[in-house]
């Protein structure tokens, strides 16, 4: 999926609002995903998955940091997430559909915290960006 110059600008704009809340939004995204899609819990058998868990907060911060990294390197998402792509494809072997589920949950978190900023145009750009991130993270599965 190709991001237009306008999409890139929109993504950078929304990430400027959310990057200071990385741990909070990342953890909330994971909690929402675990609740809505309980099958995703299977990748975290060693985690305390309860609300407010330190492990969920720490991993949520990593998830948000990866998204911020991708947004900061929006012209080279593949390069920015190369090591993470290798990790998920070769070691963790996460089912690729889970990246889409995570993206949906992230979108909901952004909508909850920044409803006026998530205009239809921004929403479309963020969706394209999250799809691009998911494509990068699954590119080495083939």
From Swiss-Prot:
One of its GO terms (cellular component) is haptoglobin-hemoglobin complex. The keyword Iron applies. InterPro entries: Globin, Globin-like_sf, Globin/Proto, Hemoglobin_a-typ, Hemoglobin_oxygen_transport, Hemoglobin_pi. O2 binds at residue 59. The keyword Iron applies. Pfam families: Globin. Residues 2-142 form the Globin domain. Heme b binds at residue 88. GO terms for molecular function: haptoglobin binding; heme binding; iron ion binding; organic acid binding; oxygen binding; oxygen carrier activity; peroxidase activity. Red blood cells. Gene3D superfamilies: Globins. Keywords: Heme, Iron, Metal-binding, Oxygen transport, Transport. GO terms for biological process: hydrogen peroxide catabolic process. Involved in oxygen transport from the lung to the various peripheral tissues. Heterotetramer of two alpha chains and two beta chains. Belongs to the globin family. This is Hemoglobin subunit alpha. The gene is HBA.
